[in-house]
Amino acid sequence: KTKMSSYKSVPTEFTIEEALDTTEISDLRDEMQEWVDNMSGTGLENTNKYQMAEEAVSQLENVDSINFDEIWDELPDDGLISADELMAVKFTSNLYTPKSRKQHPSRAYRLSNAITHITDALQEMRDYIEDKLGAKEMPEEVKSLMSAIGDIESQIQELDNVEFPGMFS
């Protein structure tokens, strides 16, 4: 990661539905795949950079197995909490953005921001559901929902170990 000092933290408001978005992660995977394709068949194929890019692609590919519908499918239409209600819950995530407008955020920061807003959204769902239930017994479908949230959370956390090759390394 680049030095923190060139980035600032910006509170960003999301609805849960907006935050449960893996587009940025898929874009990063595609960018790394492009690197791999461009280096294939060249002398760069045996470099550390090639291996790192390849490794990043294979880790980021796990994003395809993340399916937020698994969460929404757990919610019955007539249940305690509706999917629409949950999707509309607003919260704030602190995302990092370069201090200089000329600078694009690094891949590591783009990934980190995506992981942050998805993880925050999952936590926000948990809190919302627990508040809504209060002291009531947790119904089966809510237990399944919590377990679906936990599964997705672990999948997202695995993406936190992805390392991107530097332009010049």
Residue ranges and their predicted role:
Residues T2-E24, E31-S169:
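Long, low-complexity or tandemly repetitive, helically biased scaffold regions used
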